[in-house]
Amino acid sequence: LLSAASAAVALAAADTYVVVLALTDMMAGVGIGIDALQRATPIISGFLLGYIAVLPLIGRLSDLLDRRRILLGCLLVFAVGSAVTALAVEMPVLITGRVLQGVGGGGLVPATLALVADLWPPHRRGTPLGVVGAVQELGSVLGPVLGAVVLAWSGWQAIFWLNVAAALVLYAVIHLLGSRSV
């Protein structure tokens, strides 16, 4: 269960910077020219704002509710945000999709960290907490590389359709592995 939740954290972290190489293509896709690069900053900052905004809220919710359900809900929000982003042909829709991705992705972190508290006794939590932190950072580092690989084969929208597919697979795995309440 922790492996699947950690993979979800890595997926969301990768999305922070996966758009770096796709930014100009995304701008063109919503009708913004390269000469207006400053208008594209919300594509990245919208994700980050959503990501950061939900950290304390989801942390508290995961203390009160079933952590697995919180994880599943966050994965669904992330998948919906990814689909909205992939379908966007206007900047406000693209930003909305990115914010939704951030909200879903940001919620995965505290829910996964709380899951560690359920699965390990206090004196054994160091390693699993380190794993979650490491995969989050690895996701951030690999995001631009993954974006480049996808862009070599397809358009920028494929990045987000792959997110949808990965989120749904992780949803199924977490649902199956965590069929008991955690």
Regions found by a protein language model. Give the residues of each.
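Interfacial helix-cap and linker-helix signal at transmembrane-aqueous boundaries
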Residues: 26-27, 61-62, 146-154
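C-terminal membrane-cytosol helix-exit motif in multi-pass small-molecule transporters
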Residues: 164-182
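Central cavity-lining transmembrane alpha-helices of secondary-active solute carriers
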Residues: 45-59, 109-113
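Helix-breaking motifs and short loop linkers at transmembrane-helix boundaries and internal kinks
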Residues: 29-31, 66, 87-93, 121, ...
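Cytoplasmic helix-loop-helix junction between adjacent transmembrane helices
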Residues: 101-134
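Residue-level signature of the transmembrane alpha-helical cores
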Residues: 8, 71-77, 81, 97, ...
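Extracellular/periplasmic helix-loop-helix junction of adjacent transmembrane segments
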Residues: 22-53
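Conserved MFS/SLC helix-loop-helix module at the cytosolic interface between two early adjacent transmembrane helices
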Residues: 53-89
